Amino acid sequence: MKIGYFCNITNWKKKSYTEILDNARDIADYCDKNNWNSIWFTEHHFNHEGMESSPNPLMICTDVAARTKKIRLGQACNVITFWNPIRLAEDIAALDHLSKGRVEVGVGRGIYGREALHLNIEADLKDQAKNKRLFEETLTIMKKAWTEKFFSHQGEFYTFPAPDFVWQHDLSPPNEDFVDLKTNKLNVCIVILTKIKLS
């Protein structure tokens, strides 16, 4: 059996943010030293009730990765409808490298409308069908970024590479897999930093 710790960083008692983060670090250190399998951090924004203390679980996981040796680092969850899918895929891949492969990826659609309205209007929870389509497209792009050497995507919400983008980097050697050698328009996007195991 594997046991993980759900570390929902909250601030019900209105402590200083430094104290809140130090407490989360202490919990992570304890779990690492006592052979817990994983620790999981949440994502919340604009929450005056006390749950706003973890707006970016990847940054928290990066800090914990530098302080621990064995424990796996999870996000419960990355609200992927709020983020650019390529940027999020890169950040998760970078964390996987920094932690030496200890990342557990959790993704979700969000639960608070006030978060969606201020971070990505397309993710508005009043339109659940649209939110679900955005979630599915974002996850598809992230999976492409992690598993394909080169990729392109054209969907309802995102198009990569951007239409009519012209590559003008003189130091890059010509590569027709990457760019149309006649027009210099990108054929694909490259964001691979690591191969994330999808299961």
What are these regions (language model features)?
Residues 1-67, 71-72:
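N-terminal beta1-alpha1-beta2 module of alpha/beta enzyme domains
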Residues 5-9, 43, 75-77, 107-109, ...:
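A cross-domain feature marking catalytic cores of carbohydrate-active enzymes
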Residues 36-43, 72-80, 108-114, 140-146:
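Low-complexity, flexible helical/coil segments
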Residues 48-53, 78-83, 127-130:
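Glycine-rich "substrate-gating" loop/helix at the edge of Rossmann-like oxidoreductase active sites
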Residues 7-21, 78-86, 185-194:
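Active-site mouth loops of central-metabolism enzymes
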Residues 84-199:
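Internal, glycine-rich beta/alpha segment that forms the wall or movable "lid"
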Residues 24-27, 61, 71, 76, ...:
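Short, flexible coil/linker segments at or flanking structured domains
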Residues 2-4, 38, 70-77, 102-106, ...:
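Structural preference for beta-strand elements that scaffold enzyme active sites
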